[in-house]
Amino acid sequence: LYSSAASDVYKRQIRNARYERQKQLGIFPGMDNFLSERQFHDKWEDNPHAEWDARAMAVHAAMIDRVDQGIGQVIEALKKTGQLDNTLILFLSDNGCSNEDCQNMTGGENDRPDMTRDGKKIIYPRNKQVLPGPQTTYASLGARWSNVANTPFRFWKAKSYEGGICTPMIAHWPKGIKKNVGGMTSEIGHVMDIMATCIDLADAEYPTTYKGHDILPMEGKSLLPIFKTGHRKGHDYLGFEHFNERAFLSNDGWKLVRPKNNSQWELYNLNEDRSEQHDLAAKYPEKVAEMAKAYEAWAKRCMVEPYPGQKKK
């Protein structure tokens, strides 16, 4: 899959090849240059863990292949039972590729497993002394390969830039999807819309109480109108906050980003700059103020901020 001596070249080639493929597919129509700058320019020959890092990406590719095979088995089973055409299949990831480094991890810590299902100890190669591959080794891609995996975007999981929060979704439902079949849509959605979609499809209603207590209304909105007509009245804004990383996206394509508590808001026009290469905050301060005010209102309403122990911004 990958030769360690050539992996730095491969990183550039793979990233560029993915970018060219995205252009061919018309994923970002009307944009001619949406590949963000590489975030790392160090040389592969200076990497003391070159062989380990190359193997980690090879294992990652193999895992994706196994996922693909598993999905194929599900689809074949649905075909055999005659249920495929009337089954809604949604496929997406939960965030961008992770930059986490297993050198900083310990088995049994947080959600990290310390043994396999049959009781074998899992090795966390803090010095990358054991190559990735077997189920008894824990591996990760790290930031450099994540920058490749998240092409064309900047950054990765846990960040509020597109490389962290943009998760394209595939929907398959022959009997239900009536518009733009086999195509793409630029309609904006959120993972919380999935539950709203399921409730809509089931012709059910979201409850207003639980055991005599009022509960908060559902934030998500059904994706069904997009499947049937190609459009819907979606969210006016979508807000994000994770480890003090903040983002706020408007339905007209503007996006605020604040990567730290003490950072200034950054402003991007995703209609023209999908990979967030040009900060327009200084050019459009009124837009920043408008969206920042809306973010504060959203954060308060959804009880995102302030949270216990939160430091002043």
What are these regions, as identified by a protein language model?
Residues 64, 71-74, 78, 87-94, ...:
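Beta-strand elements within well-structured catalytic alpha/beta cores of enzymes
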Residues 34-55, 194, 251-252, 256, ...:
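Long, internal low-complexity/basic segments
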Residues 4, 33-34, 75, 87, ...:
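Short, solvent-exposed loop/turn and secondary-structure capping segments
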Residues 96-104, 229-235:
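Secretory-pathway/luminal and periplasmic proteins that interact with or process carbohydrate-rich
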Residues 1-6, 10:
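Single conserved hydrophobic/aromatic residue that forms the stacking wall/gate
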Residues 12-21, 29, 50-87, 97, ...:
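A long, amphipathic alpha-helix that forms part
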Residues 13-17, 21, 55, 59-62, ...:
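Extracytoplasmic/secreted proteins, especially bacterial periplasmic and envelope-associated proteins
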Residues 134-165, 172, 176-187, 192-270, ...:
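C-terminal cap/loop subdomain of S1 sulfatases and analogous C-terminal strand-loop tails that border
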